[in-house]
Amino acid sequence: DFEEKTFKAMQETAPLLKKISVERIFIEFDKLLAADFWRKGLEKLIDTKAYQYLPELGDKGSCLQLLLDRLDPAFCFQSSEQAWAMLLIALDINEPKTFLKNWKTSNDFQKSVSNLVAAYRKREVASTDRFLVYQYGLENLLLVENLRKAQGLPVENEQIKALDAALLIHAKHEIVVNGGILMAELGLQPGPNLGHILNEIETAIVDGDLINEKEAIFDFL
């Protein structure tokens, strides 16, 4: 039948993938992961062993199968970054940036996916808290919870949203003082100690123990 012919053709042409640019392969594999029918596409990739000709995936057939097995059959990825993060998690990759660099991806993409992988692994061992939400951001953590839900794991969506809403700052640059101000107005010297003080201020504000106002911060010091 047609499907059998297609399958045979895929098997026969798979070695030609070696002659296609990595950038092009990334675009096509990324499209596959983003598609509603991604499971069927990945199943064919595994069955034909075409993955053997893809960067970093030469001996990862069982890990790719694990990706299928772990996620709910009806699940679809919400973004490319989420899809690649879950792929890296299934492959148990310890250096996401190196893996993605070999796929010729952009630095921004590498950073986004690496952050998702790191956030996912933090959630494997801990519940969410203020600093986790501050460190990785609301959007990333909700993508992580989406992956957890697809695997039948407990999720903390409402807790994450509440923690995000309670944060006084969402990025370091929002703090009303910086190293220059501390040196100019308090006579602090540049160096490791100044960096330590700035980290203490940031942590106290994120934890809700210090308001983000100049006078309060000076009193804190």
Regions from the language model: what does each represent?
Residues 3-4, 19, 35, 172, ...:
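Conserved phosphate/pyrophosphate-binding and hydrolysis machinery centered on Walker-type P-loop NTPases
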